[in-house]
Amino acid sequence: MVTSDETVLATTTNKTSITTEPMEPKSSDESTDSETDKIKILKAEQREALTEATGSVEVNGNEENGHVECATVDEVAHVEEDKVEEATNSVVDLSSNGSSATTSVPVEEQEEKANEDETNDVVMETSENGENGKEENGTAMEVAENPAVTENGSKSDGETETDRVAIKDSQEDDSEPVNGSVKPEEKEEKNDTDAPMEEEDQNGKGVKRPVECIQLDDDDDDIQEVSPPVPAKKQKTEETKQEPKQEAKAEPADDNEQAQIRLLDKLQEYVGDQRGQPCNKTRKVLDTLLGAINAQVQKEPLSVRKLILDKVLVLPNTISFPPSQVCDLLIEHDPEMPLAKVINRMFGEERPKLSDSEKRERQQMKQHNPVSHMTKLLVDIGQDLVQETTYCDIVHAKNLPEIPKNIETYKQVAAQLKPVWETLKRKNEPYKLKMSRCGVCGFQTESKLAMAAHKETLHFTGSKFQCTLCKETDTNEQRMKEHYFEAHLIIAKSEEKESKYPCAICEEDFNFKGVREQHYKQCKKDYIRIRNIMMPKQEDHLYLNRWLWERPPVDPSIIQQQQAAALQQAEQKKRHQQALLREQHAQAQAAQLLRKQQLQQQQQAQRLREQQAQAQYRQMAQLIQQQQQQQNRNNANNMSNSLIQAMQAQLRRSGTGTSPQNLNLLQKQMAAVLKNQNPAQIQALVASMNKQTQSPKTPTTPKVAKAAATPTLPLAMSASSSSPGVSFQCEICDQTVHEKDKYLSHLQVLHKQMVGKTLQDMTQGAPLACSRCRDRFWTYEGLERHLVMSHGLVTADLLLKAQKKEDGGRCKTCGKQYAFNMLQHLVADHQVKLCSAEIMYSCDVCAFKCSSYQTLEAHLSSTHPKSADKKKEELITLDD
């Protein structure tokens, strides 16, 4: 093998036998310069011979696919044999012709010393080269030598072995080895076995003695001095060796690159053909790539195999697409490999378990974001940027909210956070863009496109136009545009004028504000109309979704399940409704039965009360009759008879309408009359009982008659002949009272109202009227209660009573009686909205007004006294 470091001439042999003439040892004093000169001459001749042999082998060698075949060169072998013989003979001649004294040094030591003086350049090696001298990327040159070296160039008896001689050139260590050369360690193996014995003698007789094979270091300085290089020959040799080296290097690389280019071209062509063809492949991308590779394997199997072995081409069995706005994750995999196994290989068998907070955060992100994966990606990028900024401030101790108290602890924390900050800094590098700045106006942006568009706009500095790409200035706008086009090939745009009075909707500019306002009114109407027209409806959203997303395939099993679930839900709903109806019907029947029972109980209780009342009346009648019989003897016979007749008529005609209260009242009155025996009282009692007998039932409570409808009668007629069957409902407590005089006494006794009034005053009608509904009332408290319950108006007096916990009474809505907190009950329980009202009292005769009813009464009594021609009516005016 020929390299730039060494030149090897190899011949296969089993034994190495070199016959030389016997040499006599010489002393160191007898060594002359002639021996050194001869050795130099011999080495120069050997180099020339080896160079010529190498050149002939390289010229005549055949190259195929980057490999150089071995050649057997007979001429080189013969030349080398002659050179070796000449070198041996010259050494023998020098040793035999020297005029030195004989010493007792053995023959082996003399030979070793002679070899050292010869610069140790001849190395005898016996090795066999496997693979016929061929390596992976280089070749080895073999030369077979059959003749054995003898003393006069003849063969020794019985020896027909081949010799392998390796001659190393120590002067070529620094040159570059040829591509594919075998390592020097493999070429220069030590021969630890004993050297073959040589048969030599001074008289030509062979004597066997051991010959040592010496391996010398190429880096020995003494050898370099002894054997200087030949510049001319070495340069020529290197030129001849570097040419095949470059060819051997270039060819494999070119082959790989060409194979890759051809494969990529075929892949592109195949994928382009398959992309437009309809197919039923479930793994579109993976099957297309594998089909393209298989098609190329059939055409160039060796090149594709070499790419696979060099790990340039990898056959995929799984292709995964990252999450996007269209899909969460898409994986195409080999059907022989289950999906679970693919996921385990991609993400690992043990998936990280999320904490409760992370699960909650992920669920919230899915609820509030339609594309949660992309949102999570952007959120992570933002969090990393914020963390990097925070950690940078902590590590460099800047922008801190306060000075750290413990400096050592802070330094430890900063040292721990520094690698984390560096990692985040490297991770966030793609998201940090360099700010570009306009040199004319100072505009800054991270986008190069935005900066390019900005620089296309003319910049006016106040007195002249400045080019944004160079230092050109001009006062004329057209000339500056021509400069942009000629110098920079850019069509410049004029700078937009600043808006004076722009429209907020269409951004149209106006010179005057009034014109802008007129335009804005019409523009707003048009904008609202167009927005209502262009507003998408529910059908538009439906059509848009149908256009964006394909309709999923119909699965009969899923439809059947959905239909069965819908039927089951309908049946459950129907059964639930039927159960509700049955329950409601049962509740209605129970309520009806309860009402019947209550009605029966009430009827029975009423009959019982009537029977008791009749028994009491009989007893009273008997008592009265007995007493009257005793008293009739005196002066009251007629009166007692009339009383007895009235009582009997009352007992006979007493019906279901008589209440226990009236019976008790009659009993008390009769007892008092009998005790006092006052004729006037007995006459009045008889008249009242006659009236009650004439009215069998008490009618429902009508409203108080108006003053205009009530005729003005004298006191005697009104007292004796008041309209029968009329009942009054108290405007303060809602209690029903028969007869006007009883109602007056009810107001005076129970409610302490209308004190000092007589029945004649009530004949003129109720004095107080509501300005909202024109209803009339006898008392001020009744008017206040009506305003609150019916109209939600609160007077100042009622508000003062509420503050003092004196706003009691009966609620008209629910009928409950309250000692206080009536207003709070209306607001909380009945949701009545209350507002304040101021009541002004005005005189009907004159224009007098006041806020107090007592003041109005004093005014009427003093200014307008009672007379037959005047009526006393006060009208209330409400100022809300």
Swiss-Prot record:
Any Gene Ontology biological process: vulval development
The organism's place on the tree of life at top rank: Eukaryota
Start-end of CCHC-type zinc fingers: 501-523
PROSITE patterns hit by this protein: ZINC_FINGER_C2H2_1
Compositional bias ranges of the Basic and acidic residues kind: 23-37, 154-170, 183-193, 235-252, 350-364
Zinc finger annotations (C2H2-type) as residue ranges: 436-459, 465-488, 728-751, 768-791, 809-830, 841-864
UniProt-recorded name of the protein: MOG interacting and ectopic P-granules protein 1
Species: Caenorhabditis briggsae
